[in-house]
Every structure is written in C-alpha cells, then in structure tokens.
Amino acid sequence: MRILKVRVQNINSLKGNWSINFEDPAYAAGGLFAICGPTGAGKSSLLDAICIALYGSTPRLGYLTGSTNEAMTRGTGIMESEVTFLAKGVRYRALYSQRRARNQADGRLQSANIELSRWNDEINNWEILEGKYKQKSEAK
C-alpha cells in the first residue's frame, strides 16, 4: 500500500483543514521524507488521522465511538479524515467523519460516517465499496 493523499479536518492539534499530496513532485522526487516539528505541531495527529481513516481507531486513543471521540479537536463540532492510497495498482479512498449535533462544540456526538471507495476510470469518479452513514430522519 502506498499513501497518495491525506486530508484532515479538526483532529487533535490539527485544527481547521489540512492536506498533504504525496503525489506532488516535491515528495515524489526524494522518495523519502520526515515528519518533524516542535511539540504540539501535529506530527502524532497526522499519524492518528491516517489510522482513523483506515481503521476507525488509533494506537494511542483506541476506537472512536458514538459516545467518545478523543481525536476531535476541542472546541470544534466536526472532524474528518480522508486517505487516498494505492494497493495492487488500484486507487482507493478511506473516509471517516464524525460531528456533534448542530456542528456545535457542545453538541451531542453523532454516529460516524465511514466510507471505502475505489476510483473507477470508466465513470471518472469514486465508486463506494462499503459505507456506514448516519441516516437523517424524515420530516413528518
């Protein structure tokens, strides 16, 4: 497996939207890179984001559930992690997102949306292979 892109929103110290494109020539040319920075810069948060998208858990925080999410940045109402990767020549995208009610920091934690997609060249779009979504109730 080769990680191609990582997109993060509000995971631990990585508040806001962040993305890294490992297909960028700056990364591709060297073949090797390091994750470095001062304490609190987001090095572990970046690795957490990758684990969350792929597995729904991290080694240091455990599984995220509908009642607990230690990875969501404090004071925010939504978190998301997306990893695009290549496995056996096929491009996949793993996505994990979770929000609080009304997208407010004090809202109740909602069920996570989890998705695994494969790139389909024929339709030039992502094809969902597996997904778990919070269903919105219909108005009566």
Locate the predicted segments by residue.
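Extreme N-terminal "head/tail" segments of very large remodeling/mechanoenzyme assemblies
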Residues: M1-K140
